[in-house]
Structure formats: structure tokens, C-alpha cells
């Protein structure tokens, strides 16, 4: 659905997106993560054609965005119809009520005059159909009782729900979210993420999240890409990224391993199918050995509890311990 290969984007002489490649498949929730200035919002704006890029390829629905931006404005407008977007600041019209804000894309894209539709070859939607569509969207986001309210009368979470309804008005296949929860409190953030997950599951909409909030990524993303100074420092499935981070990712996440100098340190990764099993206690009893637990942590990733653990064993027990671990289905590596 979205394929990016060796993408480079410059602002003047400054390289802000540096050789980025990724693929986002239909129906995925994909996070683009980074600190402020990492280039994540710029990358998002390249995806929907709001920013040009100088090198590489960026295809959405198998269409090269650069070609559409430069030569085919009508095709680019049609592509954007299939891409909804929500923002940190909600981007609502303050002088229009909730209903009118959500109806705006429909009234802009469609004509409400059959004569104009025929004369100018435009798509037609009646006011009755618009009202039905808007009311349906407001029901989906839980704001059907607020249709006549104005943005100033809404909480931050309610404003974002209006923005989500508006983004869904033209039945997009992709929903882009640019720091959509960063201005919200934790409880409201949780509710908005649940709504986005529901929309993804029920309508099959591909979701691309730009965020600096790790909890957002862990809550709903299936895959992620981590950017630093416009470069990828990690990408892949969420459990792999957070349970087996590389050195750059550990630095990015502010993590470090403190390990004993004596004995053999083994880091264990518990995939979802064995995360709840008492592998370690069974191993101690079966092999009749002693070992120390150095540290461990459990992460809730996409609603599943996954964990890793570092144990310190005697060097003489290495072969039988590793053989037991292999047979248990637990992933491992010698930590150093």
C-alpha cells in the first residue's frame, strides 16, 4: 500500500530525510517514532504529497507521489481523497459547529447541485445524504449528541474525535496521524487510541502514526520505524523492536544493561506463546542448578504481555542450560 525506497528530502542543503526505506501493508497500524526534529512529520507530509522529495521512490497505491505532485494535480487530489489526516492541534473551524466541521470535506469534494454535477462532470451528494453520512460518523466516534456544539465547547479528546470523524468523511483507505495524542492527558489518549484501533479493525483502514510517545507505539502499533536525524535506527515488528533493541535503539530509549562481570549472562526473550510459562523455575528444578536473576521486565505490547530476562549462570552449566532453553521455545543470546 505504501512503499518507500531510499528516500531523501532536503531543505536547502540540509538533509532531513536520509535514505529511508519502508513498506506499510494494507490494514496495518504502523508507527513512525522519533524525538522532535527527527524528520517524522516531514516523512508523513511526503506520503500525502504536501512535501516534495529529491531522491528515491515513494509510492502510495502503486503511484509515485513525486510524479503526481509535479504533473498530475487532478490525480493527486483523488489520491488525497483516499488519505485522511488528523493533527495535534485538531485543525477544526472554530466558527462552525461539530456537524459542519465533519460535513466540510463532503461539501468540498461533492457538489450538491445535480446540474453542476452533469455540467462539470463532478460527483453528486445531496444534503440529505451528507447529513446521513455525518450523523453516522459522529455515532462511530461517540459524539452524535454533540452535533450542534462548537469547538470551544468541547474538551481536547472530543475535538480529536471530531477531527477523526472529519478525516473519515471521504471513506479513506489510509489514516495519517501526526502527533494526534500528544496534547491529550493519559486517560484521553487511551480512549483515542482505542477508537483508532476500533476504526482499523472494523473498516480495515491502514493507520500511520507519527509520535514521540513510546506508550502510544506499544499500545496499538503492529510495526514501527524509529527515526533519528532523518535516519532509520530501527524498524520492524513491535515485539522485536522493544524486546531485542539494538545498541542505537537502547540509546534512543534510554536503556542500558548492567551485567555481572563473573559467570555467563544469558538474555532470554519470551515470545507471546511462551511468555506465561514458568520456564525458568522448571529449568532450575529439572537441571538441579542455581542461577541468579540479574534483571527482567515485562512489556505490554499491542495488548499482549511479553518479557525478557537476564540470568547469570555458572560457566560449567552453559551447555545443558542452553539446550534446555532451546527446547522450551524461548529466544536467547549471550549478553555482554
UniProtKB/Swiss-Prot annotation:
This is Methionine import ATP-binding protein MetN. It catalyses: L-methionine(out) + ATP + H2O = L-methionine(in) + ADP + phosphate + H(+); D-methionine(out) + ATP + H2O = D-methionine(in) + ADP + phosphate + H(+). It comes from Campylobacter jejuni subsp. jejuni serotype O:2 (strain ATCC 700819 / NCTC 11168). It is found in: Cell inner membrane. Residues 2-254 form the ABC transporter domain. The keyword Transcription regulation does not apply. Part of the ABC transporter complex MetNIQ involved in methionine import. Responsible for energy coupling to the transport system. Gene3D superfamilies: 3.30.70.260, P-loop containing nucleotide triphosphate hydrolases. Pfam families: ABC_tran, NIL. One of its GO terms (molecular function) is ABC-type D-methionine transporter activity. Its EC number is 7.4.2.11. It comes from the Bacteria. ATP binds at residues 34-41.
